[in-house]
């Protein structure tokens, strides 16, 4: 698997709605109507199967060939079907499958006997049975349950699909080659799966849902203890202008109501209603006469009166086809961001207005009428999406999420929800020869969490993580347009967002905006995260004229002509886009050198923001590590060996003194012993000195060997080394750093050259503040800078994080050996040249 970080790939094949009542489970609705044709890019699928077979998990050769024959036999029908769909009315455009036409998809035909597995919630890898026991996709005969191609099934009346004289089976009562009753049983779990991740694996597909069961008291939501105030029937929105925090959402059994809902007409519009019981009654009456036809509603009400049935469970199941090596990541992101939140919103509306059950009955009634009239598949789905808000919601979620867009779904006049998989806004890698390229994606390492920012940070943190206070906000749209959307939303965050947007500048960090505007830093970070999450802004290092910017190697030159026209409209009197890109393609130099005068500063900053917004340029940043020369290594080696020898000699002298003292005490106690016996024993000990154990002798040698553990025998003393992480240095690396610091001069060479006053007494004058970094001993500056010399943190962070002037910081870095395109006239001391630096994005 490549290290390239990929944009969201939902791998979405279909969405299924299953409900269970006292009469049993029911397959209510699925979209798209025929995933076999809408996701049928068979050549790509063949490559995936071939790669899996190499790993011992693919099909056998005969099965693969059978599948290939089955796929090719229906190509002509599919081509004819595509031509028919292209000529469809605009009202039926939702059946064309254009949303997923560019996605990697396949033939998902399933046998009656399929290998499947059910796994509990979690982020585990695909279960073993999903890759084993695979069945071939065989073309079936007249008695088959395989779903027919929609070109034949949707545009003509059929006498029956169960053979000559058999009962009529409409095409919408089967999915992926299996009849609806199979899916009803398979995707209707037991109550033990209530509000848990329910996952079923069948061949290459994953079926993931979040089933919701009715409570024992017959309600769908735990009733909280109400205080003496009116009941609030509101769903706090999660799009622009609305807070998506769990504590601001309605109380739920698990303390989180899904969070990302909003009301409104447009993508960024949102409204939150607080309804009294009277308003709720009016809202129900309004909803009853809304999008659905009154005749159909009255028919359903009649059925409800006779049936007296009630729903006990609903499960919205998402059918996914993720790549095998990305299975866990892709399923987790769509489960956390889409499946769970969508099901929670439906649960909340079901508890409030019996929404899911009413819509399920309405959909079933429309399908029964279509079956009686033998309506075509296209006509039925057009009718369902026009008349059922739940069917329309599932359709919107599928089409938007498949295209990696924000799905704004309106469940009722009072409640809507916005869902998305947070997009990838940047990448630190250039694609390799075998990797898929994403031209125009911002190429930078600036948004990565580094050890200095958060040493314990997890790479898989949530998208709403707190942004670093030293970042700035770059709006991805016109400020006036965003302000208009925010003010129109009317959400709880709208006033704060509008105030922050007016104060925000890409040249000022969050901390600087907080200090100048009086807005608390935590509030700014929350508002900025809100804008970033909803794709209206991007967090970047603050723009500065002393920073260096280059043309991004990942820029999309195919859009240069369109971008040039847009650039000309935005900056008509300034150099054209090709000229700006040509200038930035030369020798890297600070951006301030491109600004003609101070009067043009703000305008050129606006140009830079425009270029960054489109991914045309990226910041060229410097990184450094501490270099340990052979001279330093040898000095530390000699010092360590001297310490070991001294320690060994000290222990030896102390043991000899102890031995002599013990000998004197022994002679006094044994002076009356037999002389010959004592002499004999003494001679024997002297004759076998190498074989007779002496107290402490081997223990001393052992201690000497163990103390050598600091001396790494694999380290070469003749070559230089780099210290990767100075703030987590090993004992030996710590000794190297101590030796480096000990060699720094006490008085810099330039200390006397940058004092105020001239003449013989200049050395005793005050230090010029402009050159304070050149006159300060490096030993005093070293602790502030060393933590950034890890090769991961850009040196451009130091002035912002430490609150230092950029000029002084670069003077210190130049003394330490930083190589830049602009070399100053600073006199360097070789004893301070300890850095190895590189420059990249």
Swiss-Prot record:
Gly residues bias: start-end ranges: 257-267
GO BP field: cellular response to amino acid starvation; meiotic cell cycle; negative regulation of TORC1 signaling; positive regulation of autophagy; TORC1 signaling
Annotated Basic and acidic residues bias: 232-245
GO cellular component: GATOR1 complex
Pfam families per record: HTH_NPRL3 (PF24064), NPR3 (PF03666)
Coiled-coil region: none
Biased composition annotated in UniProt, kind: Acidic residues: 246-256, 665-674
Region (Disordered): 30-172, 221-301, 656-698
Keyword list, A-Z: Meiosis, Signal
Signal peptide limits: 1-23
Compositional bias (Low complexity): 61-73, 84-106, 288-299, 675-689
Ranges of biased composition (kind: Basic residues): 43-52, 221-231
Keyword Phosphoprotein set for record: no
InterPro entries from the UniProt entry: HTH_NPRL3, Npr3
Record function comment: Mediates inactivation of the TORC1 complex in response to amino acid starvation. Required for meiotic nuclear division.
Family in the record: Belongs to the NPR3 family.
Protein name: Nitrogen permease regulator 3
Taxonomic lineage from the root: Eukaryota, Fungi, Dikarya, Ascomycota, Pezizomycotina
